[in-house]
Amino acid sequence: MKLLHLDASVLGDNSVSRQLSAAVVARFTGQIDGLQVDYRDLDANPVPHLRSSSLARTDAAEATDAEQVMQQFLDADIVVIGAPMYNFSIPSTLKAWIDRVAVAGRTFKYTENGPVGLASGKRVIIASSRGGIYTDSPADFQEPFLRQVFAFMGINEVEFVRAEGIAYSPQHREDAIAGALAALPSHEVVEAVAA
């Protein structure tokens, strides 16, 4: 079984989403023997944004990296993403990664009856952090976008582990992290994924 772990925060060791994504991964690695984890830090090792040269495949190194990104995603049974909310949405580095895996003919296809996802059978867990509180707010373009893009690729099991209001005060931050850690996938859920 393979797990793909991505982090998109620019805050390094001060990142709440990184702390939460690491806890999610630890929950899975602690319970699934032989779990192979592939990790990519999208801040330290970003996926290039799509450009005309990307489509023309004139940059061999970029084309090779794009194929590796795609293959890691296709091979993963579980995808864990540390995704902070930036300006009501996601970091551009995460969007660049999504642009490399949401590819017609690879992870979805168009039909006369509408798009069909080709990447089903995966479980996605998003470790989300937000300075304010945006759940059920019209300003939340992060979670709806991530749910939609993964559903478009055929992945309907998308779970969020969320810490909100972390910029309000140190106590809010601590409480939000504790609440998010308490909401990690249960041992039963992990066992069901491993089965």
UniProtKB/Swiss-Prot annotation:
InterPro entries: Flavodoxin_fold (IPR003680), Flavoprotein-like_sf (IPR029039), FMN-dep_NADH:Q_OxRdtase_AzoR1 (IPR050104), NADH:quinone_OxRdtase_FMN_depd (IPR023048). Keywords: Flavoprotein, FMN, NAD, Oxidoreductase. It holds the Pfam family Flavodoxin_2. Its EC number is 1.6.5.-, 1.7.1.17. Gene3D superfamilies: 3.40.50.360. One of its GO terms (molecular function) is oxidoreductase activity, acting on NAD(P)H, quinone or similar compound as acceptor. It comes from the Bacteria. Its cofactor is FMN. FMN binds at S9, S15, V16, S17, M85, Y86, N87, F88, S129, R130, G131, G132. Binds 1 FMN per subunit. It catalyses: 2 a quinone + NADH + H(+) = 2 a 1,4-benzosemiquinone + NAD(+); N,N-dimethyl-1,4-phenylenediamine + anthranilate + 2 NAD(+) = 2-(4-dimethylaminophenyl)diazenylbenzoate + 2 NADH + 2 H(+). Quinone reductase that provides resistance to thiol-specific stress caused by electrophilic quinones. Also exhibits azoreductase activity. Catalyzes the reductive cleavage of the azo bond in aromatic azo compounds to the corresponding amines. Homodimer. Belongs to the azoreductase type 1 family. This is FMN-dependent NADH:quinone oxidoreductase.
